[in-house]
Amino acid sequence: MRVVVQRAKDAKVTVAGEVVGEIDFGLVLLVGITHDDTEEDAAFVADKIAHLRIFEDEHGKMNVSLIDVGGAILSISQFTLYGDCRKGRRPNFMDAAKPEHAKHIYEAFNEQLRQKGIRVETGVFGAMMDVMLTNVGPVTLIVESK
């Protein structure tokens, strides 16, 4: 499992011109799933992200978590995170999970975050989406399960 984590002042995702998910403050997650990812991977990554100390404390030091600041998450499924660009000029997506498996793990991941008391907004799995955000910092990290 591979997740790009972006700290955001605000973010929204639209499908066919309609807003389907929106947050005011928190994290935007681009979530990629590979073939052998499990619900345990989803739980590990969800816990890691929920407790990452990437928000500033009163001294301006990155020292508090999303849970500490009461932020929300905009979670977007993105199979292209497993695109292999080493050969040729066209990415190979063979490492991305099949849609049925990916959707199951993606939904389990979002549920793990919700169980921690985090408000989670999502896009539409498998849809063409427009994602807009204001990245604060900017702070962008990659969290992987393996």
UniProtKB/Swiss-Prot annotation:
GO terms for biological process: D-amino acid catabolic process. Its EC number is 3.1.1.96. One of its GO terms (molecular function) is tRNA binding. It catalyses: glycyl-tRNA(Ala) + H2O = tRNA(Ala) + glycine + H(+); a D-aminoacyl-tRNA + H2O = a tRNA + a D-alpha-amino acid + H(+). GO terms for cellular component: cytoplasm. It is found in: Cytoplasm. Coiled coil: none annotated. Keywords: Cytoplasm, Hydrolase, RNA-binding, tRNA-binding. Homodimer. Belongs to the DTD family. PANTHER family: D-AMINOACYL-TRNA DEACYLASE 1, D-TYROSYL-TRNA TYR DEACYLASE. A Gly-cisPro motif from one monomer fits into the active site of the other monomer to allow specific chiral rejection of L-amino acids. This is D-aminoacyl-tRNA deacylase.
